């Protein structure tokens, strides 16, 4: 999944020197009473000195102050209680900054310096997300994702059965195949996939034995997933790989790549909606919707549009065709 950071400009934080006290009669903008002697003037409004107060501490303001979203603050009150602070260094943010999917704000200068979680893209520091962990294969995992990470093969296989059950509800069938699951590191995954997979999370290896007459005697399929993957991420990845398995069983694995991979991503989308509704699933779905890859991103959006118009049954029937044509 690609990092989903948004570059935006900070809201105007205006540092203003207070106007000098004057000896004229005006109406106080705060209390509505007449001002007989001295007053503050700012932005066309007049105040008794004791009524020009800080929104945070309610004490009178003298000297310089900060105006933010129409409210006035002592500089120190704004800095300590109101100003947006960088989630990495803790300093006040001004000017241009970054906001991740989860609402964490960062100075733009940290973009190339901090380590981010390989799954949720949150930045990881000693103070942010409790430092996270690092796997031997180089992957980094924040503590939030680590709380649900799947490291035991028994748990992974149980999840695979749950995902398969969801896909069987819409017409897929996995009873015809000897199917096994393995948890491995990124280094081994890259060797298996020969670096050809998009945003590598899983890989499926297919074996088919035929007799002398060309009839299939046995099918053996091995699904490989990254060790330590967060639960929701694993659910989506299993749905993707199991849809490839179904395509293989129907002899349609080598069809149009955008339709094939887009369909697998749609299966991830559908299963996540059924099994794991929530912010983690929404993050994965949003990343797929924003993916600019012609095969995985555009393919997914085309399949999603097709299913929304024609339904799940028509989509499965189209996948089973020899040379399916997916409308653009």
Residue ranges and their predicted role:
Residues 196-235, 242-249:
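Active-site scaffold of zinc-dependent metalloenzymes
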Residues 1-4:
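Positively charged n-region of N-terminal signal peptides that target proteins for export
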Residues 43, 80-82, 87-208:
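A metal-dependent hydrolase signature that marks the N-terminal structural subdomain at the beginning
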Residues 7-16:
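Bacterial N-terminal signal peptides
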Residues 21-25:
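Boundary at the C-terminal end of the N-terminal hydrophobic targeting segment
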Residues 83, 112-122, 132-133, 172, ...:
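Pan-zinc metallopeptidase signature
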Residues 250, 254-295:
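Post-HExxH zinc-binding segment in Zn-dependent metallohydrolases
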């Amino acid at each position: 999944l690609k990092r989903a950071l948004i570059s935006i400009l900070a809201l105007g934080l205006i540092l203003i020197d207070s106007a000098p006290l004057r000896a004229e009669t005006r109406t106080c903008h705060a209390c509505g009473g007449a001002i007989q002697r001295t007053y503050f003037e700012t932005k066309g409004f007049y105040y008794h000195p004791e009524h020009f107060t800080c929104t945070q501490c309610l004490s009178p303001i003298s000297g310089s102050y900060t105006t933010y979203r129409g409210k006035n603050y002592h500089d120190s009150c704004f800095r300590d209680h109101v100003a947006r602070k960088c989630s990495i260094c803790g300093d006040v943010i001004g000017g241009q900054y970054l906001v991740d999917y989860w609402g964490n704000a960062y100075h733009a200068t940290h973009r190339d310096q901090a380590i981010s979680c390989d799954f949720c893209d949150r930045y990881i520091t000693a103070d942010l997300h409790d430092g996270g962990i690092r796997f031997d294969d180089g992957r980094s995992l924040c503590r939030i994702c680590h709380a649900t990470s799947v490291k035991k093969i028994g748990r992974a296989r149980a999840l695979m059965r749950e995902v398969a059950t969801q896909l069987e509800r819409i017409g897929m069938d996995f009873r015809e195949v000897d199917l096994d699951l393995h948890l491995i590191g990124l280094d081994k995954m890259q060797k298996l996939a020969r670096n050809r997979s998009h945003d590598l999370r899983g890989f499926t290896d297919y074996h088919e034995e035929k007799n002398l007459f060309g009839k299939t005697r046995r099918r053996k399929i091995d699904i490989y997933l990254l060790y330590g993957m967060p639960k929701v991420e694993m659910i989506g990845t299993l749905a993707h790989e199991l849809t490839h398995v179904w395509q293989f069983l129907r002899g349609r694995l080598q069809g149009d790549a955008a339709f094939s991979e887009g369909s697998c991503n749609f299966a991830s989308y559908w299963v996540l909606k059924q099994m794991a509704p929530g912010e983690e699933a929404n993050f994965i779905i949003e990343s797929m919707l924003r993916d600019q890859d012609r095969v995985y991103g555009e393919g997914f959006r085309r399949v999603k549009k097709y299913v929304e118009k024609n339904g799940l049954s028509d989509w499965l029937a189209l996948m089973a065709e020899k040379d399916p044509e997916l409308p653009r």
